[in-house]
Amino acid sequence: MMFTDWHEAAIGKTHNRMNFDCGDADLNQFLQRHARQNHEKGTTKTYVALDNSDVTRIHGFYSVSPASLIYAQVPGAISKGLGRYDVPVFRLGRLAVDKSMQGQGLGAQLLLSAGKRCIQAALQVGGVALLIDAKNKQVCDWYKGFGAVPLNDQPLSLLLSFKTLYAALSASGRL
């Protein structure tokens, strides 16, 4: 089942961050204490999935920022054809879904939304992939299900190429 009764917005003061609970204290704390401030300062941008009938209720969120990787860290499938210098990417710093919404496909939708946002930015400033730091093997395997590949030297850090994301966005009619 795919949950579709939501819309995305930049995090703001009117959004009820205190009632969000994804089951992970660190992610909850980031949303409650740091996400909006970081967004306003420009260090990391956070976007929230809001309930269409209650625009203060946060169902999920993701945070992104620009980053780069040393060429040697990047798997060959992504580095092929690139110059041998730092590889421009976007870091998916956090992605979480409220416990009440887990298992309804919102996490996948947020991943695609983050990918689309970063692809659009990359058209202006460059970038080839989404860099993901998985918290554990289970989360790592979830991202691998979308085509993410581990970095050469860090098995819980993955790259999801914009080529793969673009294909998924096209297939889902989200471009």
Curated annotation (Swiss-Prot):
Name the gene for this chain. Answer: tacT3
The record's family statement is: Belongs to the acetyltransferase family. GNAT subfamily.
Q: What induces it?
A: TacA3-TacT3 autorepresses its transcription at low TacT3 concentrations, at higher TacT3 levels it derepresses transcription. The tacA3-tacT3 operon is up-regulated 5-fold in a relA-spoT-dependent manner within 30 minutes of phagocytosis by mouse bone marrow-derived macrophages.
Tell me its EC number(s), please: 2.3.1.-
Q: What would changing residue 80 to E do, according to UniProt?
A: 54% toxicity in E.coli. Loss of tRNA-binding
* Protein name (database record): tRNA-acetylating toxin 3
Q: What happens when the gene is disrupted?
A: Deleting the operon causes 50% reduction in persister cell formation in mouse bone marrow-derived macrophages. All 3 tacA-tacT operons can be deleted without an effect on growth in cell culture.
Subunit comment for this entry?
Answer: Homodimer (in absence of antitoxin); has a condensed and elongated form. Forms a complex with cognate antitoxin TacA3. Forms a 4:2 antitoxin:toxin complex with cognate antitoxin TacA3. Forms a 4:4 antitoxin:toxin complex with promoter DNA, where 2 TacT3 dimers bridge 2 TacA3 dimers. Only TacA3 contacts promoter DNA in the octomeric form. TacT3 may contact DNA in the hexameric form.
Q: What positions does UniProt annotate as the active site of this protein?
A: 143
Gene Ontology terms for molecular function: acyltransferase activity, transferring groups other than amino-acyl groups; tRNA binding
Q: Per the record's keyword annotation, is tRNA-binding included, yes or no?
A: yes
Q: What's written under domain?
A: The C-terminus is an important element for recognition by the cognate antitoxin.
What this chain does, per the entry, is described as: Toxic component of a type II toxin-antitoxin (TA) system. Acetylates tRNA and inhibits translation. Acetylates only Gly-tRNA on all 3 Gly-tRNA(Gly) isoacceptors in situ. In vitro acetylates mainly Ile/Leu and Gly. Overexpression during the lag phase of a tacA3-tacT3 deletion strain leads to a 150-fold increase in persister cells in the presence of cefotaxime and a non-growth state in the absence of antibiotic. Persister cell formation and the growth defect are neutralized by cognate antitoxin TacA3, but not by TacA1 or TacA2. Plays a role in persister cell formation.
Q: Which domain of life is it from?
A: Bacteria
SUPFAM superfamilies in the record, alphabetically?
Answer: Acyl-CoA N-acyltransferases (Nat) (SSF55729)
Q: Which species?
A: Salmonella typhimurium (strain 14028s / SGSC 2262)
Q: Which InterPro entries match?
A: Acyl_CoA_acyltransferase, GNAT_dom
Task: Kindly state which keywords UniProt assigns to this record, in alphabetical order.
Answer: Acyltransferase, Repressor, RNA-binding, Toxin-antitoxin system, Transcription, Transcription regulation, Transferase, tRNA-binding
Q: Which reaction does it catalyse?
A: glycyl-tRNA(Gly) + acetyl-CoA = N-acetylglycyl-tRNA(Gly) + CoA + H(+)
- UniProt binding sites for acetyl-CoA: 95, 97, 103, 105, 107-108, 133, 138, 141-142, 145-146
